[in-house]
Regions:
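Anionic-ligand binding patches
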Residues: 2-5, 12-188
């Protein structure tokens, strides 16, 4: 396989993705590029747009990731706009708006988009959980401190390394790795 670039301006996201893909025999190079994102509630639409922009910049096989929180009680928002809400509200404001002093059911969704010049492929992963009433153990992955996956008493940020094993991102990356093996993009 030619070099696969992961286009993101987030070094923590790159590190996590590289760690998850390594056991699959997939090595990714970091392309530290901030892509202008379209504003949409649709995570798939944002990921598809980002990967096409990334491919036009790199002219090589590229992958991007976009994730968000889907809250059915709020009409599927913030969805693809989670980062916009997060930037405007911060951790406390996010909890105040979306949990309103009670935990609110949520789905964390990640979409990996891949483009190799011939086509765009999307790979999805999701995790059910809830938005907690107060941020816990704020770390580098913004809303990880407010999302508590089902079957756990801790938020993603409190789970530390366990998060990498159960996250929506891992699920999407596992699908992506299987695709690359099946399509003979890598040798296993």
């Amino acid at each position: 396989m030619r070099t696969l670039y992961f286009v993101t301006s987030n070094p923590n996201k790159y590190k996590e993705v590289a760690e998850i893909l390594k056991p699959h025999g997939i090595q990714v190079e970091w392309a530290n590029i901030k892509l202008k994102e379209i504003q949409s509630n649709d995570i798939d639409e944002i990921a598809r747009d980002k990967v096409l922009k990334a491919f036009r910049r790199m002219m090589a096989p590229v992958m991007v990731e976009h994730d968000g929180l889907i809250l059915e009680e709020f009409g599927q928002i913030p969805g693809g706009l989670t980062q916009v809400f997060w930037d405007a509200l911060g951790a406390q404001g996010f909890c105040r708006l979306f949990s309103r002093d009670k935990e609110t059911a949520a789905v964390a969704q990640a979409v990996i988009a891949y483009c190799d010049s011939r086509k765009v492929e999307l790979f999805r992963g999701s995790a059910k959980g809830k938005i907690v009433t107060e941020p816990r153990d704020y770390e580098d992955f913004q809303w990880d401190c407010v999302f508590q996956p089902d079957e756990y008493e801790e938020t993603y940020s409190q789970l530390g390394e366990i998060k990498k094993e159960i996250s929506m991102r891992r699920k999407a990356l596992n699908e992506f790795a299987e695709y690359l093996k099946r399509e003979k993009c890598i040798h296993s």
